[in-house]
Amino acid sequence: MKVRPSVKKICPKCKVIRRRGVLRVICENPRHKQRQG
């Protein structure tokens, strides 16, 4: 899980979703998981 000031899709399978007001990126590739800090 990467914590970043700005989250972006890295590959076509990445999805940006909002959970409890926190922007997250979920993907098949675990390296692409991100959360907005």
From Swiss-Prot:
Keyword Phosphoprotein: no
Keyword Chaperone: no
GO-annotated biological processes: translation
GO molecular-function terms, A-Z: structural constituent of ribosome
InterPro entries xref list: Ribosomal_bL36, Ribosomal_bL36_sp
Family, per entry: Belongs to the bacterial ribosomal protein bL36 family.
Name of this protein: Large ribosomal subunit protein bL36
Provenance organism: Nitratidesulfovibrio vulgaris (strain ATCC 29579 / DSM 644 / CCUG 34227 / NCIMB 8303 / VKM B-1760 / Hildenborough)
Organism lineage: Bacteria, Pseudomonadati, Thermodesulfobacteriota, Desulfovibrionia, Desulfovibrionales
Gene: rpmJ
